[in-house]
């Protein structure tokens, strides 16, 4: 395999930022020699892309399926061009993809590109993926912050201003282009074959402090009304942590790339260990 971290310069942000890249160059015979797709993985608030490398088994799952992983940093931007900060959305959607294509061979076909994220990154995956349905065949949010007004209300005014003020400005008004419900409505208006497959997951115990389960159930109800062609919502026992997101990634790979993969991995996990 090949894994490297690089610093790339963003003209939009007037700064360099890190991107991690896993490239499966020693694929097992059953996978074959061709890269099957690209997963862009987005991190959560107060963290960076290293989390996707250190905590789940993302690289092993990518190797199993012949997937390239692109894992950028995005600060605490909620994957938007910030009102009082840097232009992360422009970097992630315009500059970074162009630079990476110059550096390495990445599949550009729609059916081979996917984006996923956890927590803040779950919102980010929906924010970017639904705004660019022509780029991504699959969009996945794991324990995503999918209802920012609900989250702000729960946080209280002072904390909400500290977290969201730099992103959206003093009034904390979410612009239409950053509303994932509005973006989902635009996607649903497309012909079914032009719509990405959308997967959202949430843990049944992921309630406090930010009501993630409630946020996702409310978003689920909105999506049922909107009616995109391909939307799935899954929930099971779990809290806001990496065991849940590791399993969520397996479900995303199963749904987008390799049907049956989740059953295999769940079988691996459930197999009893016998003492001889």
Name each model feature, range by range:
Residues 1-276:
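Non-catalytic cap/lid and distal C-terminal segments of serine-dependent acyl enzymes
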């Amino acid at each position: 395999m090949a894994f490297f971290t690089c610093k790339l310069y963003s003209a939009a942000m007037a700064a360099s930022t890190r991107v991690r890249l896993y490239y499966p160059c020693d694929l097992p015979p059953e996978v074959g020699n061709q890269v099957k797709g690209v997963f862009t993985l987005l991190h959560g608030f107060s963290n960076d892309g290293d989390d996707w490398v250190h905590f789940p088994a993302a690289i092993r799952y990518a190797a199993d399926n012949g997937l390239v992983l692109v894992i950028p940093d995005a600060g605490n931007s909620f994957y938007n061009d910030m009102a009082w900060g840097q232009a992360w959305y422009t970097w992630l959607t315009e500059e970074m993809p162009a630079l990476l294509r110059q550096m390495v061979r990445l599949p550009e076909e729609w059916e081979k590109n996917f984006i996923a994220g956890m927590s803040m990154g779950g919102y980010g995956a929906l924010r970017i993926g639904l705004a660019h349905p022509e780029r991504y065949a699959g969009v996945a949010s794991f324990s995503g912050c999918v209802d920012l007004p609900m989250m702000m209300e729960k946080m209280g005014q002072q904390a909400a201003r500290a977290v969201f003020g730099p992103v959206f400005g003093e009034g904390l008004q979410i612009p239409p282009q950053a509303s994932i419900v509005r973006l989902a409505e635009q996607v649903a208006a497309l012909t079914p074959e032009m719509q990405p497959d959308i997967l959202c997951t949430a843990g049944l115990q992921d309630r406090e402090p930010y009501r993630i389960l409630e946020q996702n159930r409310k978003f689920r109800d909105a999506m049922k009304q909107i009616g995109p062609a391909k939307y799935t919502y899954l929930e099971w026992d779990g809290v806001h942590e990496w065991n849940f997101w590791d399993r969520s990634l397996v479900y995303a790979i199963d749904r987008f790339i390799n049907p049956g993969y989740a059953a295999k991995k769940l079988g691996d996990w459930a197999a009893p260990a016998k003492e001889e």
